[in-house]
Amino acid sequence: MRRANDPQRREKIIQATLEAVKLYGIHAVTHRKIATLAGVPLGSMTYYFSGIDELLLEAFSSFTEIMSRQYQAFFSDVSDAPGACQAITDMIYSSQVATPDNMELMYQLYALASRKPLLKTVMQNWMQRSQQTLEQWFEPGTARALDAFIEGMTLHFVTDRKPLSREEILRMVERVAG
């Protein structure tokens, strides 16, 4: 195996894959589009990855890891369940995690995960990490309900014609939390 000229090339390709998914949609992503966005020769695609499925798996695995770290960061100063409810509310209301780019990637991942078992596993692992974070303050069933609420309310918050106020979101979070 020859040495790679650019030690960051593999990571550039992974990041360009996510960019291609955002720009073109998952079904229009090609090796050529990714290589162009990454600024690498087309041959690099098959040098580092066995095919588009492996590339999508690596890209979405990277994306969900980053999202999990951002998710956990919202809870870094939380010491109790009421504090966790406040953090959940902040996460939804601030849209810091649910940026337009992140939301586009989430939509694409949801759509493809229903047809690709490996990507479904990526989704399941991501949900498990989120729920484990919440289980620091809530029992597993409540953590799962809160995680589902966060996903759904995040979608509603970024698409509603008139998003809810922070106080309205907090009341809903507290209801789900019990």
Swiss-Prot record:
Residues 7-67 form the HTH tetR-type domain. InterPro entries: Homeodomain-like_sf, HTH_TetR, Tet_transcr_reg_TetR-rel_C_sf, TetR_C_31. Gene3D superfamilies: Tetracycline Repressor, domain 2. GO terms for molecular function: DNA binding; DNA-binding transcription factor activity. Residues 30-49 bind DNA. The keyword Zinc-finger does not apply. Keywords: DNA-binding, Transcription, Transcription regulation. GO terms for biological process: DNA-templated transcription; positive regulation of DNA-templated transcription. Pfam families: TetR_C_31, TetR_N. Induction: Autoregulated. Has a strong cooperative DNA-binding mode, leading to aggregation of RcdA-DNA complexes. Regulates the expression of a number of genes involved in biofilm formation and stress response. Target genes include six stress-response transcriptional regulators: csgD, which is a master regulator of biofilm formation, appY, sxy, ycgF, fimB and rcdA itself. This indicates that a large number of genes must be regulated indirectly via these transcriptional regulators. Acts by binding to the upstream region of its target genes. This is HTH-type transcriptional regulator RcdA. It comes from Escherichia coli (strain K12). The lineage of its organism: Bacteria, Pseudomonadati, Pseudomonadota, Gammaproteobacteria, Enterobacterales. The gene is rcdA.
